[in-house]
Amino acid sequence: MARAVHRSGLVALGIVTALMASCAFAAKDVVVAVGSNFTTLDPYDANDTLSQAVAKSFYQGLFGLDKEMKLKNVLAESYTVSDDGITYTVKLREGIKFQDGTDFNAAAVKANLDRASDPANHLKRYNLYKNIAKTEAIDPTTVKITLKQPFSAFINILAHPATAMISPAALEKYGKEIGFHPVGTGPYELDTWNQTDFVKVKKFAGYWQPGLPKLDSITWRPVADNNTRAAMLQTGEAQFAFPIPYEQAALLEKNKNIELMASPSIMQRYISMNVTQKPFDNPKVREALNYAINRPALVKVAFAGYATPATGVVPPSIAYAQSYKPWPYDPVKARELLKEAGYPNGFSTTLWSSHNHSTAQKVLQFTQQQLAQVGIKAQVTAMDAGQRAAEVEGKGQKESGVRMFYTGWSASTGEADWALSPLFASQNWPPTLFNTAFYSNKQVDDFLAQALKTNDPAEKTSLYKAAQDIIWQESPWIPLVVEKLVSAHSKNLTGFWIMPDTGFSFEDADLQ
């Protein structure tokens, strides 16, 4: 006789089974809320750290930097340098494929470095690679790179996030459109890029490191408003958020489901002054503006204490950084200097910001108020990524509208040259690089060039000090603060953190 089975039992069993399956195979999808939009997914053509950080989803370099900014091997196994400092021979890992099935080998490295070092391609990061004379594929796992002249920081250039290995087949297929079609050796591949809303990446099944990645997808979502970014974390709409609004840090820290992190930074915040334009061509005006800003108050008002007043033009944690006596807040002295410079009643100018998130807005408002106290009327504009690319990065000195410009810089190579040359060398005015002060001093240029020709630490220290002494004295900047990096994440997200250069490390990220 057949046993009777009640329908209600079958239904209950089905529900339990479905729930168990759901738990066992729940997708590990992470949403990361970031402070601004992305300009491109081509690391060689991006000037902003965020775009390059997101590009690490798809791309890897020959070398990289760990969270202490120390050099590590990635797609390379080792390297040697010739005695004259001209030739770098790099041994590559074997058996790695790009996401389109193309082999990663010496020919692929050559294709990327040939593209990067060709000025005809007009890539924004060209200056990193302009010293490459030629790249040769000696055999499938050996690359020889010959420089035009000794460049002691070159291996750090190869570790820069811009030096990504892109599939040569994809480069040939997409050409100048490669920024919309990333194909690398990284742990994730592109799923969707909605240019006004998000970039979503998905697990690359053929990734060469066993057991990785652990996440199924990451959605990078730009959220300009600080409060909205923090709210997304609290409601579970996002699992990681950076930057965290400083004024909300204490509140988030009390949330039992969220972990708040304040980590070291090499992010220097500053205001450059266009020294080729009146009144900023007058050293007394630049000195006056440095006296006009109350940096300790700025730390409290805009950064809620998560920053320190700048004591130089290079963050202290970068090798060869020099520290100086901080600029005191002295509005009386500022007004005296303005009078001596021929501006007893002050002047009107513009103050632009490279970002439009809430913290940048606070810095602009604070600075505007401080300048007003010494008679300077500043019209402020907070730019989005597209405006910055068009109006600041894309225009040369003659057509540039930049006067005062609030921005930040992190030396993503982890060494002093990249903290100084892109921002102060004469050849690095926009659109070449990011010398938005349009500063030029032959002695500084010479000292920076000489420092790259020696591997002697004592000589490098002397040369970098001499350059920084001149820059500090001539004041093309108003150095403001060095940030602390405040991020937060759901406690069930592990292995995801902020690098000192404000990039991200997420290769080992997992959702528990």
Curated annotation (Swiss-Prot):
Keywords (A to Z) from UniProt: Periplasm, Signal, Transport
Domain of life of the organism encoding this protein: Bacteria
Cross-referenced InterPro entries: Peptide/Ni-bd, SBP_5, SBP_5_CS, SBP_5_dom
UniProt GO MF annotations: peptide transmembrane transporter activity
CDD domains the UniProt entry points to: PBP2_Ylib_like (cd08499)
Chief localization: periplasm
GO cellular component: ATP-binding cassette (ABC) transporter complex; outer membrane-bounded periplasmic space
GO biological process, one term: dipeptide transport
The UniProt record lists the keyword Lyase: no
Compartments, as annotated in UniProt: Periplasm
Signal peptide: 1-26
Signal listed as a keyword: yes
Family designation: Belongs to the bacterial solute-binding protein 5 family.
Record's subunit section: The complex is composed of two ATP-binding proteins (GsiA), two transmembrane proteins (GsiC and GsiD) and a solute-binding protein (GsiB).
Known role: Part of the ABC transporter complex GsiABCD involved in glutathione import. Binds glutathione.
Name listed for the protein in its UniProt record: Glutathione-binding protein GsiB
Organism, as annotated: Shigella dysenteriae serotype 1 (strain Sd197)
Gene name for this UniProt entry: gsiB
